[in-house]
């Protein structure tokens, strides 16, 4: 059996698909030390630059002094601390939905929602470019799993119209993690209301970045109706929020159903309460420091100007995710390694994370990048385009 595994690993390496784990030797930042070398990095999801913020470091220390470093039990036994409860209430008020429920990861949050609400006899409708967690959850639920072409609402409408399923659940990324484009949330909600379907919106990459005071994709457009029983909202707390975890926001009966039937909620140790305590401070910074989002917008515009004439197209995106489409995996890896030689870290994204022939450099920006950082990346890529 080990020989089979070794052969499969060799084949993966020959195809340019082998993955390895870089080891960071300091805090998350645009300037990092990896395996003993200093790099300018454009690959983290720390969009607002909060992961190493002094106020969050102090809040984490305060949380540890108050609650210790481990929760010791699941939320349903004795692992639900005051800090968890206060954060859930603060998040509900922030996103404007009645209730929220904390999870250790976005993957676990999506898994809980989909498997608790859908099963045999039900149907799940999914955008073809959704995150793996939504796909895995749909498969595990044993509901009928129906995918529609990326952002193709006409096809989705036909699928919803013809289904005989007992329950219908539409699942989609709000901001697509590998393309940086956004789902038409208002139109999706209208469809779901028309066909009596829930909409699970995964806003992992929009929360903190988009909308009024960073409230996320629900606030990116004035046309989005948030006071509806059809909406289920998920966002993560380890990206723009700079810490760790995730939450689901919805009407009270949905949240109570997740508490009763969400297996990834009830059958796991709760996240340390010190993280929830830290996230209360993070939420204040997200809400109050609008300059971070304003700066991100300026950096996004600057990057797109610097890269517009390259032979590799930059996909359309107004978010911090700026994918440079390369094509073949080997070419993406070549660019990745050539940038590393120049002290710049932008890992290649290859299948199966993206479709075959769609390998790319996923450039992600942070509010704490500088104009000089962006210019340096642009100059390096223009130089490589001549090679």
UniProtKB/Swiss-Prot annotation:
Residues modified as N6-(pyridoxal phosphate)lysine: 239
Family matches, as CDD domains: KBL_like
Positions with a binding annotation for pyridoxal 5'-phosphate: 106-107, 177, 205, 236
Keyword terms, alphabetized: Biotin biosynthesis, Pyridoxal phosphate, Transferase
Gene Ontology terms, MF aspect: 8-amino-7-oxononanoate synthase activity; pyridoxal phosphate binding
S-S bonds: none
Catalyzed chemical reaction(s): 6-carboxyhexanoyl-[ACP] + L-alanine + H(+) = (8S)-8-amino-7-oxononanoate + holo-[ACP] + CO2
GO biological process: biotin biosynthetic process
Pathway: Cofactor biosynthesis; biotin biosynthesis
Pfam families with a match to the protein in the record: Aminotran_1_2
SUPFAM superfamilies, A to Z: PLP-dependent transferases
Source superkingdom: Bacteria
Cofactor: pyridoxal 5'-phosphate
UniProt entry tagged with the keyword Cytoplasm: no
Chain sites annotated for binding substrate: 19, 131, 353
Entry EC number(s): 2.3.1.47
Role of this protein: Catalyzes the decarboxylative condensation of pimeloyl-[acyl-carrier protein] and L-alanine to produce 8-amino-7-oxononanoate (AON), [acyl-carrier protein], and carbon dioxide.
Family: Belongs to the class-II pyridoxal-phosphate-dependent aminotransferase family. BioF subfamily.
HAMAP family: BioF_aminotrans_2
Assembly, per entry: Homodimer.
NCBIfam families membership: bioF
Name this protein carries in UniProt: 8-amino-7-oxononanoate synthase
Species, as recorded: Nitrosomonas europaea (strain ATCC 19718 / CIP 103999 / KCTC 2705 / NBRC 14298)
Species lineage: Bacteria, Pseudomonadati, Pseudomonadota, Betaproteobacteria, Nitrosomonadales
């Amino acid at each position: 059996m080990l020989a089979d595994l070794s052969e499969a690993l060799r084949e993966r390496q020959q195809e340019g698909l082998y993955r390895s784990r870089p080891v960071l030797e300091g805090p998350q930042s645009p300037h990092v030390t990896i395996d003993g070398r200093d790099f300018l990095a454009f690959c983290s999801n720390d969009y607002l630059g909060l992961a190493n913020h002094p106020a969050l470091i102090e809040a984490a220390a305060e949380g540890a002094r108050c609650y210790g470093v481990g929760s010791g039990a699941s939320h349903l036994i004795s692992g639900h601390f005051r800090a968890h409860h206060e954060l859930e209430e603060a998040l509900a008020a922030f996103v404007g939905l009645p209730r929220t429920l904390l999870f250790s990861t976005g993957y676990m949050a999506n898994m809980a929602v989909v498997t608790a609400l859908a099963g045999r006899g039900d149907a799940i409708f999914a955008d073809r470019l959704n995150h793996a967690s939504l796909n895995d959850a749909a498969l595990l639920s044993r509901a009928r799993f129906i995918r529609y072409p990326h952002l193709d609402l006409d096809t989705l409408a036909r699928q919803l119209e013809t289904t005989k399923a007992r329950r219908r659940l539409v699942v989609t990324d709000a901001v697509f993690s590998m393309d940086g484009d956004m789902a038409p949330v208002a139109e999706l909600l209208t469809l779901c209301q028309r066909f009596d379907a829930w909409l699970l919106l995964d806003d992992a990459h929009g929360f903190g970045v988009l909308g009024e005071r960073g409230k996320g994709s629900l606030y990116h457009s004035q046309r989005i109706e948030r006071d509806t029983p059809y909406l289920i909202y998920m966002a993560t707390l380890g990206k723009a929020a700079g810490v760790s975890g995730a939450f689901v926001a919805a009407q009270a009966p949905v949240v109570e159903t997740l508490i009763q039937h969400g297996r990834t909620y009830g059958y796991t140790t709760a996240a340390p309460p010190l993280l929830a305590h830290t996230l209360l401070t993070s939420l204040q910074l997200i809400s109050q420091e609008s300059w971070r989002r304003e700066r991100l917008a300026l950096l996004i515009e600057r990057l797109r100007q610097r890269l517009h004439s390259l032979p590799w197209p930059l996909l359309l995106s107004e978010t911090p995710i700026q994918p440079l489409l390369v094509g073949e995996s080997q070419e993406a890896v070549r660019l990745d390694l050539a940038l590393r030689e120049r002290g710049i870290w932008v890992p290649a994204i290859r299948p199966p994370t993206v479709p075959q022939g769609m390998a790319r450099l996923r450039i992600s920006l942070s509010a704490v990048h500088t104009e000089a950082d962006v210019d340096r990346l642009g100059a390096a890529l223009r130089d490589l385009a001549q090679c």
